[in-house]
Swiss-Prot record:
One of its GO terms (cellular component) is nucleus. Residues 4-24 form the ELK domain. The keyword DNA-binding applies. Keywords: DNA-binding, Homeobox, Nucleus. PROSITE patterns: ELK, HOMEOBOX_1, HOMEOBOX_2. One of its GO terms (molecular function) is DNA-binding transcription factor activity, RNA polymerase II-specific. PANTHER family: HOMEOBOX PROTEIN TRANSCRIPTION FACTORS. The gene is KNOX10. Residues 25-88 bind DNA. InterPro entries: ELK_dom (IPR005539), HD (IPR001356), Homeobox_CS (IPR017970), Homeodomain-like_sf (IPR009057), KN_HD (IPR008422), TALE_homeobox (IPR050224). It comes from the Eukaryota. This is Homeobox protein knotted-1-like 10.
């Protein structure tokens, strides 16, 4: 009975599952930020630890100097504050 159900489900959804698999395997893999970009962000972090909220201009400058996108800069600061910042 279990095998019958398994076979029916596979027959019904195998095309959908294989297309999902192809789509997932094509997606860009997420990875760590480049080392030099992380170092630049950490340097800014250390200089501004008491209030680590860069202005829009500072974020644009960081994006330019690191080669990262604005969204990556924003996410890095959100994660860094959440994980490592203890408000004074």
């Amino acid at each position: 009975e279990d095998n019958d159900l398994k076979n029916r489900l596979l027959n019904k959804y195998s095309g959908y599952l294989s297309s999902l698999w192809r789509e997932l395997s094509r997606k860009k893999k997420k990875g760590k930020l480049p080392r030099d970009a992380r170092q630049k962000l950490l340097h800014w972090w250390q200089l501004h630890y008491r209030w680590p909220y860069p202005s829009e201009l500072e974020k644009a400058a960081l994006a330019e100097s690191t080669g990262l996108e604005a969204k990556q800069i924003n996410n890095w600061f959100i994660n860094q504050r959440k994980r490592h910042w203890k408000q004074a």
